[in-house]
Amino acid sequence: MQPLVLFATSEMYPFSKSGGLGDVLGALPLTLHRMGVRTAVVTPFYGRLKTAEYGIHLTMSDIPVGYPWGPITADVYEADFHGMPVYFISRGEYFDRRFYYNDYKGDYFDNCERFVFFCRAAASMCRRLGEAPAVVHAHDWQTALLPALLYHWRRYDSFWEDTRTVMTIHNLAFQGRFSSRLFENCGLPPQAWSMDGVEFYGDFNLLKGGIAYADKVTTVSPSYAREITTPEFGCGLEGILRRRTHALHGILNGADYDIWKPEDDRFLPCTYSPDRLAGKQRCKRALLDELGLDSSLMERPVLGFIGRLRDQKGIDLLIDNIAQLMERQVGVVILGEGSLEYEAQVLHLMEEYKGRLCARVEYTEDLAHRIQAGADIFLMPSRYEPCGLTQIYALRFGTPPVASSLGGLRDTITPWPAPDATGFTFDDVSPAGFLNAIMQAVNLWENDHTAWAGMVRRAMEVSFTWEKAAVQYLDIYQQLGFVPAGE
């Protein structure tokens, strides 16, 4: 039997998704599977899962998950996802909730307990299956306990002695930081409570443990891998990341172009391609009609923003510039949810500029596609952006982005006025810096239709495939001794 790469994640599209993590885990394991690598995914069984639609069925019952006070049990469900097994860890009181990590009151009080349970249950599932994976690939703080556990277990447990681990950081700002009293129930030995382990200013830090104990650490763009070793972007973990520089790699995310493909997109009223751009104009007209925006905006640029309404995504920079943008007679479309304060502000602006600005305080996949297709310019003023996927989608949909020049945005956008420009970037992440970059884009749209059309076509032809990323991840696995079939 071929060696197995097991992906552990709290989200996987189409089963669960709150952001880019779900997209990545819906694509990377499957891409490797199609390359001939034996892969599987383990993820929580959330209450909103559509079991009938995806053929999810119970495959293991009452798996014991050990704790200091005794075992509790988990059930495991399974689905066949294009020939690749996906396992779902089920325990109702932990995962049968409306949201994944928080509600409008804040983070769930038992998030540490929930995801410690998930990690330990995933390990118990492997024992029940009778196979230790060659590589366990963990993603973000929710699964970061697994590399720490396996580092210690494989020293005395022959079942795990050949398993190696990879820890991928999708967003360093979310670390899984909890009270020190919760450490005693996680299953790690006392020596893991140290500055070189999971201890972080007196707290229990799950992501720090994953970084400390994984055999390899990756993040989702080369620029972000460099940034997180600095105090500005390291979120307090720059020290341990610098110590682990030899094991740290930046691999740019890909895009699932089977889903984000304007030539063949079930969510669009009209398809189009670099050689058939008339369809994009029809998508714009349909978007204006759908959102109740003035038809006169067909003659003006429409700016689209899709993202969480939080400081990280720079929504406040957009809000601060709305009055100036309205003076330039542009349209603005906002899609996303986040802090109640920002939600209220964008809804107020929609009332103030009715017909010119539309804000939908939600996230729906179909509308996201139609905004990418119907907008002329895409806005992404992030204060930090590990990789970003929406700007990659915007490029493929021929909607040149205006984005801050950092992280994955720097790695994916060639800025104007370069001859091969695909968008616009800015270094001064402030309202003035953002507005200046927007006005560059608006001026080009207004005054040089030939240059704009050329940028649109170049953007659509840029390719960030998961195949490119998967080859780099496979190289990481092989550095750890993983030998794929046929080699």
Swiss-Prot record:
Assigned keywords, A-Z: Glycogen biosynthesis, Glycosyltransferase, Transferase
GO BP terms: glycogen biosynthetic process
Pathway linked to the protein: Glycan biosynthesis; glycogen biosynthesis
Catalyzed chemical reaction(s): [(1->4)-alpha-D-glucosyl](n) + ADP-alpha-D-glucose = [(1->4)-alpha-D-glucosyl](n+1) + ADP + H(+)
EC number(s) reported in the record: 2.4.1.21
Cited InterPro entries: Glyco_trans_1, GS/SS, Starch_synth_cat_dom
GO molecular function: alpha-1,4-glucan glucosyltransferase (ADP-glucose donor) activity; alpha-1,4-glucan glucosyltransferase (UDP-glucose donor) activity
Function: Synthesizes alpha-1,4-glucan chains using ADP-glucose.
UniProt xrefs under PANTHER family: ALPHA AMYLASE DOMAIN-CONTAINING PROTEIN (PTHR45825:SF11), GRANULE-BOUND STARCH SYNTHASE 1, CHLOROPLASTIC/AMYLOPLASTIC (PTHR45825)
Protein name in UniProt: Glycogen synthase
Annotated organism of origin: Oleidesulfovibrio alaskensis (strain ATCC BAA-1058 / DSM 17464 / G20)
